[in-house]
């Protein structure tokens, strides 16, 4: 895997993902990929398949709708860490970032406290449905709270992904590590996203395997 591809986080999130596909994918790439993201129901199985490697297993919380209460989200976070997740993406509505200062501070404090029982938590937002002003406000709230990691979008068109990475990189603070999830990507796009400020690029396993087909040698991994 080349340097650009080391930033890739593969997303195995389709509801119809079979155990056979999960097993085949993890067995094939567990010694070369750094991380994969699965649904909560697949955490334990993915951890078993990843044994003997350094592959990190992440999971999504309140995905894709981001409509759960804080109590429900907190419960799901705790359960996911108990199942063995190394990191979590916690999907939040834009309204969560628009709360009064105390409300958002309490939210981030609660989520931070849950990391003490498990691993890393990355906030995730549906920036693809936000207007420009809301994106700026969300980025600024992340900066105010010194939040370290954000995941942006779900299968976002590349041009929009580049724009939003640049925006959050500019307004979210120097502490913010950004992951973007574009709908498609090639080597040039990987370089452009990273140059714009993305530290991780989330790809579906279909897009990831298409990317590998474009490599000059079959043993690129």
Where are the predicted features?
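Generic structural signal for hydrophobic
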Residues: 25-29, 80-83, 111-114, 141-145, ...
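Active-site-adjacent beta->alpha loops and helix N-cap segments on the catalytic face
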Residues: 38-56, 67-75, 95-115, 129-135, ...
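Electropositive, surface-exposed helix/loop patches at the edges of structured domains
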Residues: 97, 121-140, 178-203
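Conserved N-terminal beta1-alpha1 strand-loop-helix module at the mouth
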Residues: 1-82, 141
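Hydrophobic faces of well-ordered beta-strands that scaffold small-molecule active sites
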Residues: 3-15, 34-38, 55-63, 86-90, ...
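Generic structural signal for short, solvent-exposed loop/turn connectors between secondary structure elements
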Residues: 1-7, 13-20, 30-33, 98-103, ...
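Short, electropositive alpha-helical surface patch
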Residues: 53, 116, 137-147
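Glycine-rich phosphate-binding active-site loops on the catalytic face of alpha/beta enzymes
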Residues: 59-64, 82-97, 144-160, 183-185, ...
């Amino acid at each position: 895997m080349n340097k650009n591809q080391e930033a890739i986080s593969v997303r195995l999130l389709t509801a119809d993902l079979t155990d056979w596909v999960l097993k085949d994918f993890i067995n094939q790439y567990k010694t070369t990929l750094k991380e994969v993201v699965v649904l909560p129901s697949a955490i334990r199985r993915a951890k078993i398949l990843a044994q003997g490697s350094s592959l990190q297993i992440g999971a999504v919380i309140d995905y894709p709708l981001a409509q759960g209460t804080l109590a429900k989200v907190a419960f799901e976070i705790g359960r996911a860490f108990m199942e063995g997740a190394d990191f979590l993406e916690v999907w939040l509505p834009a309204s969560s970032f628009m709360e009064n200062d105390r409300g958002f501070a309490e939210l981030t404090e609660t989520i931070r406290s849950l990391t003490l029982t498990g691993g890393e938590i990355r906030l995730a937002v549906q920036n693809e449905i936000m207007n420009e002003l809301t994106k700026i406000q969300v980025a600024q709230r992340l900066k105010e709270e010194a939040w370290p990691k954000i995941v942006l979008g779900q299968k976002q068109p590349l041009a929009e992904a580049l724009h939003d990475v640049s925006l959050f990189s500019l307004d979210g603070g120097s502490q913010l590590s950004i992951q973007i999830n574009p709908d498609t990507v090639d080597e040039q796009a990987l370089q452009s996203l990273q140059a714009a400020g993305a530290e991780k690029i989330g790809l579906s396993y279909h897009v990831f395997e298409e990317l590998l087909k474009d490599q000059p040698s079959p043993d690129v991994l």
